[in-house]
């Protein structure tokens, strides 16, 4: 009978185990894919002391236990050793045909992962506590709650791919961010009817900002996203059917300059009805457009909202415009100032106003271009004490 192998301490070694002349233990095995693999450790059992000068790591028997479990569960021993950066790159490669804005978000997250210690970690070593600590580090870097949540959602999706590919068992990013960070996102507040009228009256009579009256009125009366407004061309206004056709948006970046993209969501492609007042505003915009050289972007031209050089305005132009308008208004109305206003405030106001008038939720969802009815109902449609009172009186009466 062949004598069983023993280590330097006289202990019997199991099948596949051996000890090198330098004292280090080795375990040889065949993984789930038929490949010969090796693992090493300075300790045979968990109770063995770590040799002086060596790093504290799992013992050989602990490694064997994990290996056997992986083989039984069909876990890819090679795949689980890919880094988080490699996993995220793998996910992106599987869905390469995305919008430019999505690609920019991907590039930002990949850059953040490469700069953070978590990006170089093998995915089988990442625990929920590691993912939560990553979220805290992102907050310390100044990223907003929504940005961190979006990135966390992307990494959660990446780990689901790893689970499906039998690389890991659990998803460390499967937790609510609110468990770790306070949601400090400011609630979107609609303008009151009094504030809306005050804003329009001020712009209409101001010697500097009166030329932007129609832009602001159209935003308030259509609820368009600012990128949708900026992308409007002459061909998008259907005066006969009294609708504005939304099938694209205009964006601009430092790297790419101007570019056209499809609407934010599939539901974003829509036709928004126009009131008589809004039709007249569009007619004035067309009439006063500056004469300039034709300017085309991705095959589209004759943009409605352009600067003196004939180039389309973009979101940042309107964001800065509202900062200046509100600043000047509040300078002359210190007792009743306007709140911080952005183009999205006007979209929010439009939606809230229609909801308060009991518009059919599905119709409102269509006009707003929301992908989900819950967005329409829970995110945009804010009740007020006035509408609440009128509803109580209507129902009780």
Enumerate the language-model features and the residues they cover.
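Short, Arg/Lys-rich segments that mark the N-terminal edge of DNA/RNA- and chromatin-recognition modules
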Residues: 1-44, 248
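Short, aromatic/basic-rich helix-turn unit that serves as a nucleic-acid recognition element
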Residues: 12, 35-39, 46-52, 83-111, ...
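Basic/aromatic-enriched alpha-helical hairpins
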Residues: 69-75, 86-142, 158-161
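Short, basic (Lys/Arg/His-rich) helix/loop patches that form interaction surfaces
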Residues: 145, 201-212, 272, 288-303, ...
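Basic, Lys/Arg- and aromatic-enriched nucleic-acid-binding interface segment
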Residues: 149, 164, 168-232, 240, ...
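Catalytic-site neighborhood detector that most strongly recognizes the C-terminal catalytic loop/helix
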Residues: 182, 190, 250, 349, ...
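DNA/chromatin major-groove-contacting recognition/catalytic segments
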Residues: 199, 255-260, 357, 378, ...
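Conserved tyrosine-mediated DNA breakage-rejoining catalytic core shared by Y-recombinases
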Residues: 232-290
């Amino acid at each position: 009978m062949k004598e069983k192998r023993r280590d330097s301490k006289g202990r019997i070694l199991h099948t596949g185990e051996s000890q090198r002349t330098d004292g280090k233990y080795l375990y040889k095995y065949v993984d789930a894919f038929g490949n010969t693999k090796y693992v090493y450790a300075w300790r045979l059992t968990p109770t063995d002391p770590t040799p002086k000068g060596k790093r504290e790591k799992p013992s050989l028997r602990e490694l064997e236990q994990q290996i056997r479990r992986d083989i039984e569960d069909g876990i890819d021993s090679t795949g689980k050793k890919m880094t988080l950066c490699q996993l995220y790159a793998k996910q992106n490669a599987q869905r390469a045909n995305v919008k430019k804005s999505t690609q920019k978000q991907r590039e930002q997250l990949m850059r953040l992962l490469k700069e953070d210690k978590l990006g170089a970690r093998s995915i089988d070593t990442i625990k929920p506590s590691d993912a939560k600590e990553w979220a805290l580090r992102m907050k310390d870097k100044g990223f907003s709650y929504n940005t961190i949540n979006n990135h966390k959602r992307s990494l959660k999706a990446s780990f689901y791919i790893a689970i499906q590919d039998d690389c890991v068992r659990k998803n460390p990013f499967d937790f609510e961010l609110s468990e770790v960070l306070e949601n400090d996102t400011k609630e979107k507040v609609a303008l009151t009817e009094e504030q809306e009228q005050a804003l329009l009256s001020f712009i209409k009579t101001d010697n500097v900002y009166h030329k932007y009256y129609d832009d602001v009125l159209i935003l308030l009366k259509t609820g368009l996203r600012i990128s949708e407004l900026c992308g409007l061309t002459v061909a998008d206004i259907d005066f006969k059917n009294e609708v504005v056709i939304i099938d694209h948006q205009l964006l601009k970046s430092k790297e790419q300059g101007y570019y056209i993209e499809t609407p934010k969501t599939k539901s974003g492609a829509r036709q928004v009805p126009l009131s008589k007042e809004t039709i007249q505003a569009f007619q004035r915009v067309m009439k006063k457009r500056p004469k300039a050289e034709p300017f085309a972007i991705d095959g589209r031209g004759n943009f409605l909202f352009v600067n003196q050089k004939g180039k389309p305005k973009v979101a940042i132009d309107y964001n800065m415009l509202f900062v200046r308008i509100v600043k000047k208004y509040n300078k002359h109305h210190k007792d009743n100032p306007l709140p911080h206003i952005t183009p999205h405030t006007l979209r929010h106001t439009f939606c809230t106003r229609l909801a308060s008038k009991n518009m059919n939720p599905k119709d409102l969802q269509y006009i707003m271009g929301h992908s989900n009815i819950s967005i329409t109902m829970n995110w945009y449609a804010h009740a007020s004490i006035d509408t609440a009172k009128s509803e109580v009186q209507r129902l009780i009466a």
